[in-house]
């Protein structure tokens, strides 16, 4: 059976793994998921990630990050979904928690944070909020 929203599946796997204090989480890999993991790593929300290939299927393994026993990611939620895409222009890209969190945006110049998209002067599809 095909998955209708693979990005939401990745975010749910991360959320569920952190609720039970897992150190790593695996999910089927794709270019967008790897780009999201790279943004999460650059922003300090995860320790790292790697793509593993077994018998032609690639898996994305994310190493989760904790501080004083609590997950670093307090909130991670999907914004744009297959049934309701959310596109924002460069001036309308939202701030998450007054700049304390990040919105991950996919733009013509790649997947990036809301701050980088504003600085670059591009808009795009708001994939998710992370705080």
From Swiss-Prot:
Q: Name one GO cellular component term.
A: ribonucleoprotein complex
Q: Name one Pfam family in it.
A: Ribosomal_S8
Q: Which UniProt keywords apply?
A: Ribonucleoprotein, Ribosomal protein, RNA-binding, rRNA-binding
For whether the record's keyword set contains Ribosomal protein, the answer is: yes
Q: Name one GO molecular function term.
A: structural constituent of ribosome
Q: Name one GO biological process term.
A: translation
TM stretches of this protein: none
Q: Which residues form a coiled coil?
A: none
User: What PANTHER family does its record include?
Assistant: 40S RIBOSOMAL PROTEIN S15A
Q: Subunit comment for this entry? A: Part of the 30S ribosomal subunit. Contacts proteins S5 and S12.
Q: Which family does it belong to?
A: Belongs to the universal ribosomal protein uS8 family.
Function comment? One of the primary rRNA binding proteins, it binds directly to 16S rRNA central domain where it helps coordinate assembly of the platform of the 30S subunit.
The record's annotation in NCBIfam families points to:
PRK00136.1
This chain's protein is named: Small ribosomal subunit protein uS8
Which organism was this protein described from?
Delftia acidovorans (strain DSM 14801 / SPH-1)
List the taxonomic lineage. Bacteria, Pseudomonadati, Pseudomonadota, Betaproteobacteria, Burkholderiales
Its gene name is rpsH
């Amino acid at each position: 059976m095909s998955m209708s929203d693979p990005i939401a599946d990745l975010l749910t796997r991360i959320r569920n793994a952190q609720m039970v204090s897992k150190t790593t989480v695996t999910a089927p890999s794709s270019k967008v998921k790897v780009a999201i993991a790279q943004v999460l790593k650059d922003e300090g929300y995860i320790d790292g990630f790697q793509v593993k290939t077994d018998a032609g299927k690639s898996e994305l393994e994310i190493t989760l990050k904790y501080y004083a026993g609590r997950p670093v990611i307090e909130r991670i939620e999907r914004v744009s979904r297959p049934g309701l895409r959310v596109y924002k222009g460069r001036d309308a890209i939202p701030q998450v928690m007054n700049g304390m969190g990040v919105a991950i945006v996919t733009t013509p110049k790649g997947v990036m944070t809301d701050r980088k998209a504003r600085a670059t002067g591009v808009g795009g599809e708001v994939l998710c909020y992370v705080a």
